[in-house]
A protein has these predicted regions:
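Long, contiguous binding/interaction regions
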Residues: 1-131
Length: 131
């Protein structure tokens, strides 16, 4: 069961062939965050057209509360994009591996760059910034 106020991240991936679809979803999320069925989406990061952090291909990050999980998943699936969705806890490794939900084909992440357990810096950035 998901806690309605629990923080989540979605990493929405794209490649050259589906960048325009990713851009359309990005624009929609950015324009509608904090309103309607996206009221619990609080941050949409920049589209990063290169590998960054543990992510091997371009992506952008969406921050939201658990209440928005069904809506966020529905939007990603409807656009046929690949994504990694996870709770935001103090265990960055588990968040990105054993506790993660993949939509589409999983990608090999660079786990060596994740924060040590108990020191997840993404918690302080939640709702404010991505990398």
């Amino acid at each position: 069961m998901t806690d309605a106020n629990e923080p989540f991240h979605a990493h929405i991936y794209y490649e050259a062939f589906d960048r325009s679809t990713a851009q359309q979803l990005h624009s929609e999320l950015q324009a509608k965050k904090g309103t309607g069925d996206l009221v619990d989406v609080i941050f949409v990061g920049v589209m990063t057209d290169r590998a960054v952090g543990p992510h091997p291909i371009p992506q952008y990050e969406v921050h939201f509360y658990g209440k928005a999980l069904p809506t966020v998943l529905e939007r990603i699936k409807a656009n046929r994009l690949r994504a990694l969705v996870h709770r935001l806890t103090n265990d960055d490794l588990a968040d990105h591996t054993s506790q993660a939900l993949w939509i589409g084909e999983p990608l090999p992440l660079d786990l060596s760059v994740l924060d040590p357990a108990g020191m997840n810096q993404a918690i302080a950035r939640f709702g404010n910034s991505d990398f």
